Amino acid sequence: MRDIKTYLSTAPVLATLWFGSLAGLLIEINRLFPDALTFPFFSF
């Protein structure tokens, strides 16, 4: 179990999880607001 925790805390695994979640977030934003140069919740 300790080896699995050590493996999951290495940089390539964490980078893969981080970039995967970031890509998913950007995809969902582009799905909700297609071709948006300004987002409605950022305009003041």
From Swiss-Prot:
Any one annotated GO CC term: chloroplast thylakoid membrane
Record keywords, A-Z: Chloroplast, Membrane, Photosynthesis, Photosystem I, Plastid, Thylakoid, Transmembrane, Transmembrane helix
Membrane protein topology class: Single-pass membrane protein
InterPro entries xref list: PSI_PsaJ, PSI_PsaJ_sf
Pfam families: PSI_PsaJ (PF01701)
Domain of life assignment: Eukaryota
Subcellular location, principal: plastid
Keyword Ribonucleoprotein recorded: no
Segments passing through the bilayer: 7-27
Cellular localisation: Plastid, Chloroplast thylakoid membrane
Entries under Gene3D superfamilies matching the protein: Single helix bin
Entries under SUPFAM superfamilies matching the protein: Subunit IX of photosystem I reaction centre, PsaJ (SSF81544)
Presence of the UniProt keyword DNA damage in the record: no
Gene Ontology terms describing biological process: photosynthesis
Family statement drawn from the similarity comment of this UniProt entry: Belongs to the PsaJ family.
HAMAP family: PSI_PsaJ
Function: May help in the organization of the PsaE and PsaF subunits.
Protein name: Photosystem I reaction center subunit IX
Species this chain originates from: Calycanthus floridus var. glaucus (Eastern sweetshrub)
